């Protein structure tokens, strides 16, 4: 059975027989020896394999290996005298599993731009940067689940196909399959924009729940910050107010950041050196300080008083743009910032109305380099007020009767938030374009495989 390189690198070199399988990164020949750099994807670090002319296929195959070829190596793991590596494998056999023609294989031994790699998204995981993103993304996902499980939350699998538009913005992809009455599900259905409403169903029965899954927006935004398909982390907590919501969100973010810094050292060093210099120090600073907090009204006043010229004019009642959010986090507070109590007119119907009748108990967490990372609120638990806001938003109360029933039978204060997973991966890795942090980006005009 093959052993992962990441495990062999920390093993004691007691001249044990091992099997390594992976892809050739480089080959160099010296006299009667070939030095193969093999990577199996378990770590950024390659395993050096030393093959000599005593191998039966040395001249015919080993000396013809090139970048991208796949091999199975058996040999003895030994302590390496070479600088920068702890162990190496002295091969007793090298089996070529698959060839890669160096004339046509697009990933040769040189640095490729991230824009070029997007054009070959089926091969880009074989590069250092994108494989490192994949491992960090996996670890972040693991840490998210660990956090909520340790907190006693129950994971709920909310539907991908739904007849409800949580955001009420009409940006849903429609499901086209039809039945005898014209609609397969008996009503117009689309791909979910959020699992929040369904998560509220289970929060008002199980207490604390979370959902973590794909969401979809038919928004024609071809920017470095938007995707048509992305993943969302959405907890919902019964008997919880906005204060509790903010505390859980900040605690969760710090938990997953600490986890990645501990377990993805090699990959994070790559990002720190080649992608975003100082990213590790910036993340450590996030862990060391409380998030700043300010109301929307105070934030607008600070922007107006700054003298800064923005592309989008600032006034009370606007939806803060990325340039406003980044100015606040990067220039004013220089750390993550929680903005609360937004105007009701720019927020969805389900957010709890504040006593002033103008703002809602909402919060956004803004982070340097990204802008909005988390959006949450205390939900409106009062039947009459919720029904009034739904009517004002043009929603059919009969169609959303199930949602109103949660307030009709045993209503409780509850709160939750949504965290865009790809933006979290961006924040951690320092990647400038969101297309680099999801395995298969879906954007307007682009869905290659």
UniProtKB/Swiss-Prot annotation:
InterPro entries assigned to the protein according to its UniProt record, in alphabetical order: Aa-tRNA-synt_II, aa-tRNA-synth_II, aa-tRNA-synth_II/BPL/LPL, Asn-tRNA-ligase, Asp/Asn-tRNA-synth_IIb, NA-bd_OB-fold, NA-bd_OB_tRNA
Gene3D superfamilies: Bira Bifunctional Protein, Domain 2, Nucleic acid-binding proteins
Gene Ontology terms, MF aspect: asparagine-tRNA ligase activity; ATP binding; nucleic acid binding
A biological process term (GO) from this entry: asparaginyl-tRNA aminoacylation
Alphabetical keyword list: Aminoacyl-tRNA synthetase, ATP-binding, Cytoplasm, Ligase, Nucleotide-binding, Protein biosynthesis
Subunit structure of this chain's protein: Homodimer.
UniProt similarity note: Belongs to the class-II aminoacyl-tRNA synthetase family.
Protein name according to UniProt: Asparagine--tRNA ligase
Organism: Desulfotalea psychrophila (strain LSv54 / DSM 12343)
Taxonomic path: Bacteria, Pseudomonadati, Thermodesulfobacteriota, Desulfobulbia, Desulfobulbales
């Amino acid at each position: 059975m093959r052993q992962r390189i990441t495990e062999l690198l920390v093993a004691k070199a007691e001249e044990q027989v091992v099997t390594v399988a992976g892809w050739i990164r480089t080959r160099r020949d010296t006299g009667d020896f070939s030095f193969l750099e093999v990577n199996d994807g378990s770590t950024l670090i390659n395993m050096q394999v030393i093959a000599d002319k005593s191998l039966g296929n040395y001249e015919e195959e080993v000396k013809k290996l090139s970048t991208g070829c796949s091999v199975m190596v058996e040999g003895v793991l030994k302590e390496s005298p070479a600088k920068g590596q702890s162990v190496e494998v002295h091969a007793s056999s090298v089996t070529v599993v698959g060839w890669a023609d160096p004339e046509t294989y697009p990933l040769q031994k040189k640095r490729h731009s991230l824009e070029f790699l997007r054009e070959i998204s089926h091969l880009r995981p074989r590069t250092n940067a994108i494989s490192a993103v994949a491992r960090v993304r996996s670890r972040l996902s693991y840490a998210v689940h660990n956090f909520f499980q340790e907190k006693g939350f129950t994971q709920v699998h909310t539907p991908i196909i739904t007849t409800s538009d949580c955001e009420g913005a009409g940006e849903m992809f429609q499901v086209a399959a039809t039945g005898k009455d014209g609609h397969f599900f008996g009503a117009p259905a689309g791909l979910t924009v959020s699992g929040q409403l369904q998560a509220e169903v289970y929060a008002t029965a199980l207490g604390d729940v979370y959902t973590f899954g794909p969401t979809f927006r038919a928004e024609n935004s071809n920017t470095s910050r938007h995707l048509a398909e992305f993943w969302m982390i959405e907890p919902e907590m019964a008997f919880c107010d906005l204060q509790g919501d903010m505390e859980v969100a900040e605690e969760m973010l710090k938990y997953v950041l600490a986890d990645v810094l501990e377990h993805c050292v090699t990959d994070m060093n790559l990002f720190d050196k080649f992608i975003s210099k100082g990213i590790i120090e910036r993340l450590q600073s996030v862990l060391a300080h409380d998030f700043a907090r300010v109301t929307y009204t105070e934030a607008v006043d600070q922007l107006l008083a700054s003298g800064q010229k923005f592309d989008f004019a600032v006034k009370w009642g606007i939806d803060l743009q990325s340039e406003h959010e980044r100015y606040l986090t990067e220039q004013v507070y220089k750390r993550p910032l929680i903005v609360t109590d937004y105007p009701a007119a720019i927020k969805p119907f389900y957010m709890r109305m504040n006593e002033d009748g103008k703002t809602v108990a909402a919060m956004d967490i803004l982070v340097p380099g990204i802008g909005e990372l988390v959006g949450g609120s205390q939900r409106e638990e009062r039947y009459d007020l919720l029904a009034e806001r739904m009517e004002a938003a043009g929603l059919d109360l009969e169609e959303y009767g199930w949602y109103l029933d949660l307030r009709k039978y045993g209503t409780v204060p509850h709160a939750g938030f949504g965290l865009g997973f790809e933006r979290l991966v961006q924040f951690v890795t320092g990647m400038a374009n969101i297309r680099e942090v999801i395995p298969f980006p879906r954007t307007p005009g682009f869905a290659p495989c």
